[in-house]
């Protein structure tokens, strides 16, 4: 699910689809989901790389850096990877934009989570809090900038970063801020939902459910079953 299911969920939001209705009924038997999966499959079959059904973050990053991927929708944190001239052959040719929409009022923007968590059962709570405070501090950001460059500082830790003249020179800085400010996890889809989350439903059961559903979608992309069959199994 974390490889292909995350993207398709973001896309589905812009098509008006949702994982569950307000009564927690699965919604894969809807026209919105059929439109989402068919659009993605048709687009990738026509213009995507061979074996796209099994590609994830690392495969897509590698292709983009080699100039073999013309459009990649993923996390804003990946922007520094594709603009680093030491790793990317297209570093000086990359542009950035908000993810597209279908005219229904919601973009297919990527949003996983900006969060650092501490396990409830930890014996090192104070140390964990101290680490998080340091890892999100201005001192840490300046340390990264000094050693790795401003393009590589954590983009989601501090609002004040976007007021820094040096960071404002980074080509994707403003687009990253726009993306963060446009995120709305409580209203990620066209229709109301009982869950919070843009690319997932924030419930304990979701990872297992989403893995099963994503495997059915991947089988459809690979031609092992039809889109209709995949959606029927997801609905079940």
Per-range role (PLM):
Residues 17-26, 45-47, 65, 111-116, ...:
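Flexible glycine/proline-enriched surface loops and loop-helix/loop-strand junctions
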Residues 23-54, 95, 99:
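Glycine-centered hinge/linker elements that transmit conformational signals in sensory
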Residues 1-26, 32-33, 69:
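Extracytoplasmic/periplasmic solute-binding protein
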Residues 66-75:
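Alpha-to-beta junction loops
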Residues 51-66:
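Short helix-initiation/N-cap motifs at beta->coil->alpha
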Residues 77-91, 102-212:
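C-terminal lobe and pocket-closing loops
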Residues 208-223:
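Solvent-exposed, amphipathic alpha-helical segments
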Residues 64, 227-236:
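Short, well-structured alpha-helical segments that form the helix of a local strand-helix-strand
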């Amino acid at each position: 699910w974390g490889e292909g299911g995350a993207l398709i969920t973001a896309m589905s939001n812009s098509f008006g689809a949702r994982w569950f209705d307000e009564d927690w009924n699965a919604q894969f038997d809807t026209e919105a989901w059929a439109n989402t999966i068919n659009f993605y499959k048709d687009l990738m079959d026509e213009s995507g790389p061979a074996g796209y059904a099994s590609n994830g973050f690392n495969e897509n990053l590698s292709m983009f850096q080699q100039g073999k991927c013309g459009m990649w929708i993923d996390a804003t944190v990946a922007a520094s990877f594709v603009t680093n001239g030491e790793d990317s052959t297209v570093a000086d040719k990359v542009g950035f934009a908000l993810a597209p929409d279908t005219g229904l009022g919601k973009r297919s923007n990527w949003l996983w989570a900006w969060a650092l968590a501490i396990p409830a059962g930890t014996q090192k709570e104070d140390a964990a809090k101290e680490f998080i405070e340091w890892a999100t501090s201005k001192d840490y950001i300046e340390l990264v900038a000094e050693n790795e460059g401003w393009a590589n500082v954590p983009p989601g830790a501090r609002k004040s970063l976007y007021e820094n003249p040096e960071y404002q020179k980074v080509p994707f800085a403003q687009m990253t801020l726009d993306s963060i400010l446009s995120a709305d996890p409580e209203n990620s889809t066209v229709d109301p939902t009982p869950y919070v989350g843009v690319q997932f439903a924030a419930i304990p059961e979701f990872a297992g459910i989403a893995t099963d559903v994503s495997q059915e979608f991947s089988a459809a992309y690979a031609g092992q079953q039809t889109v209709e069959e995949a959606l029927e199994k997801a609905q079940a």
